[in-house]
Amino acid sequence: MAYPNGKLSEEKVFKDPVHRYVHVRDKLIWDLIGTREFQRLRRIKQLGTTYLTFHGAEHSRFNHSLGVYEIVRRMVDDVFKGRPEWDDSERELCLAAALLHDLGHGPFSHSFEKVFHLDHEDFTRGIILGDTEVNQVLRKVSPGFPQDVAEVIAKTYKNKQVVSLISSQIDADRMDYLQRDAYYTGVSYGHFDMERILRVMRPREDQIVIKESGMHAVEDYIMSRYQMYWQVYFHPVTRSAEVILTKILHRAKQLHDEGYVFTHAPVHFYSIFEGKLTLEDYVKLDESIILYYFQAWEDEEDAILSDLCRRFINRQLFQYVEFNPNEEMSAYFELTSLFKEAGIDPSYYLVVDSSSDLPYDFYRPGEEEERLPIHLLTQNGQIKELSRQSAIVESISGKRRTDHKLYYPKDLICDGTKHPEAKMKIRQLLGLT
C-alpha cells in the first residue's frame, strides 16, 4: 500500500547548509515532519554539550534528521532507482525510517541516558508504535507500516539493503552527521567526497557495496570519522561539561531520594526519579526544560547542586589530567581521601572519564556488537572487504583507541583558605606544583 494522496501538489524545500536543499515531494514525509514528536527534535541539540567547546555547535536533531532523509532520498530516487537488485516498492519505508531514526533522543542525549539508565532506541520504537501523531501518520500507509519502520531502525528488518542505508559503517546517518557537525563546529576534519561515494554505491544481494573505483573517497570518509571523534566528539572540554551535567542529575536524584525540599521542585523529573517514566512524560522533555532547572537550582540551598549548576550555566568547567587506570589507581584512592580531608566531595568533584572508539572494523561474527564491513565491488565482479584492499583502512581496522582523563575543580583545590595542607598534597599529586 501507499500513503493517501502520495505526492504533494508542489515540492517543498528546506534550505540546508550541508546539502543546499532538502527536497520533500511525498505527503507522508511532509506530514511526519509536522508531527509534535518530530518537531520536538528542534529542541534537542545534535551534539549535546559540545556548544560549550565549539560555540557554533547549536544545531539540532531536527537538522540532522532532515539531512539523513535527504541523503537516503537521493540514494533511492537517483542512485538505485531502476537497478535490478533494488526493490523500489520499499521507497517510502526507506524515507520514513531515515527521517525518524533519531526520534527518541532525549535532552543532552547520551549523558541523560547514562544517568537514568534509559535507551533512546526504546523511545524511538515507543513513539513509532505508540499512541502518537507519528504513529497515526504511519498507519495511513498500512496497519503494519509502523512496525516495519521500527524494525528498520532497530536493524531487524528482513531486507538488509534497506537497513544498511541508515545503519552500517558507511550509511546516510554517518555521512550527514560528519559533514553537518564539521560545518557547525567550524573544523575541517569531517569533509569527504559524499557525491563520489553516492555515485559508486550499488545494491547487491543483502547489502550495499561500493565500486572499487570509489575506494579513495571511502578512505577519506573513514579518516574523517576518526578525526572527528577525537578532535570534536571526545574533546576534553566537552567531556568536562558532560561530567558536570551528569553529576547535577545524580545530585538532584539523590536529594529527591533523601526527601530534600527543593526551592524549585523538579516536577518534570519526578517520574524519572521514581522509575515511573511514561512515553508521554518523555516526549515533553527537551533541553530548554533541563536548562531551566539548572538555572533555577543555582539558588538552591544545597551547596553541591548549586555549585555544579553555576559551573554548567556559566561554563566554569573542571580541569583535567591524563590518567592511566592500570597504573595510577593508588594515586586516585589517595586523591579521594585527600578530597574528603579538604572538605570536597570526591563523588561529585573527582571524576575519571573514559572515551573509546573503533573507527572501522571487519566482520567479527558472534560479537556483542557485530559490525558489517564495507565491501568493494571489483571490476571483475568480485566482492572484497575494504581493509583487504586499502592499506590506509587496514592500518586502523579493528584497533580500538581508548582515552582516560581525571577531572577536578582547579579553583577549589587552589583556594588555600581552608584545609591548605590537604589541598597542597592534592596539587602535588595532580602535578600542579
UniProtKB/Swiss-Prot annotation:
| CDD domains found in the cross-reference section | HDc
GO MF entry, a single one: dGTPase activity
A Pfam match is: HD
HD domain location is 61-178
Gene3D superfamilies (UniProt xref): Hypothetical protein af1432 (1.10.3210.10)
GO BP terms, alphabetized: dGTP catabolic process
SUPFAM superfamilies hit by this protein: HD-domain/PDEase-like
InterPro entries of this UniProt entry? Answer: dGTPase-like (IPR050135), HD/PDEase_dom (IPR003607), HD_assoc_2 (IPR045509), HD_domain (IPR006674)
According to UniProt, the name of this protein is: Uncharacterized protein YwfO
| UniProt organism field | Bacillus subtilis (strain 168)
Gene giving rise to this polypeptide: ywfO
